[in-house]
UniProtKB/Swiss-Prot annotation:
It comes from Mycoplasmoides gallisepticum (strain R(low / passage 15 / clone 2)). Keywords: Isomerase, tRNA processing. This is tRNA pseudouridine synthase B. The active site is at residue 41. InterPro entries: PsdUridine_synth_cat_dom_sf (IPR020103), PsdUridine_synth_N (IPR002501), tRNA_psdUridine_synth_TruB (IPR014780). NCBIfam families: TruB. Its EC number is 5.4.99.25. GO terms for biological process: mRNA pseudouridine synthesis; tRNA modification. One of its GO terms (molecular function) is tRNA pseudouridine(55) synthase activity. The lineage of its organism: Bacteria, Bacillati, Mycoplasmatota, Mycoplasmoidales, Mycoplasmoidaceae.
Length: 214
């Protein structure tokens, strides 16, 4: 397979970083230059749009693409990283009723707002990745960023778990959404699974047939 000078859609596996996945791709297919259009959490899987060699000049435009995510969350647990990999900070004992949750999600259609990114993120603070500072318990503050939820739909709801399909603007932080959602009901939540199902015009049906194992 020749992936030089092309736009390639990768299904990033769970438990590796987007950068590590990109390096595996470059090494496996002998690609000299490549970039992707948006970091996925190590916990997440799904669509990673990669541009190679001459097509990398298109990344600035690809970075503007809207995204779709399927997130699975668990109520009643809050961690420092906002996901199941983090240290548990607080637990609660309340789960909203399905009608409450559905009504709130419906109210978010075409909702633009300022979102606070998680401290455990790839954003840079004075040249250092925020997650590196967070791991060292260094105090710092991130600024809220403008974003938009186009649609939020409840897919399933059982016990303390909910699955929600999100159509959002680029730069949206799903982990922050999970925490903010729970706070609307005076409870807690953490992200337990995340799949990016679409990025711009590309979806999971467009991914190449290759397993990126370590």
């Amino acid at each position: 397979m020749d992936f030089n000078n092309k736009i390639v859609i990768i299904d990033k596996p769970k438990n590796i970083s987007s950068a590590f996945c990109l390096n595996l791709f470059k090494k496996r297919f002998n690609i000299k230059k490549a970039g992707h259009n948006g970091t996925l959490d190590p916990l997440a899987s799904g669509v990673l749009v990669v541009a190679t060699n001459k097509r990398t000049k298109e990344l600035s435009q690809l970075n503007q693409d809207d995204k779709q995510y399927l997130v699975k969350l668990k109520f009643n647990t809050h961690t420092d990283s906002y996901d199941r990999l983090g240290k548990v900070i607080r637990t609660t004992n309340y789960v909203p009723e399905i009608k409450q949750l559905n009504d709130y999600l419906t109210s978010l259609d075409n909702h633009s707002f300022y979102q606070l990114p998680p401290n455990f993120s790839a954003l840079k603070v004075n040249g250092v990745r925020a997650y590196q500072l967070a791991r060292k318990a260094v105090d710092f503050e991130l600024e809220k960023r403008p974003t938009t939820i186009y649609k939020a739909k409840l897919i399933s709801y059982y016990d303390d778990y909910a699955e929600i399909l999100l159509d959002v603007k680029k730069g949206f932080y799903v982990r922050s959404f999970v925490v903010d959602l729970a706070s609307q009901f005076n409870t807690t939540a953490m992200m337990v699974d995340l799949v990016r199902t679409r990025s711009g015009q590309y979806s999971l049906k467009d991914v190449i047939d290759y397993q990126f194992n370590k």
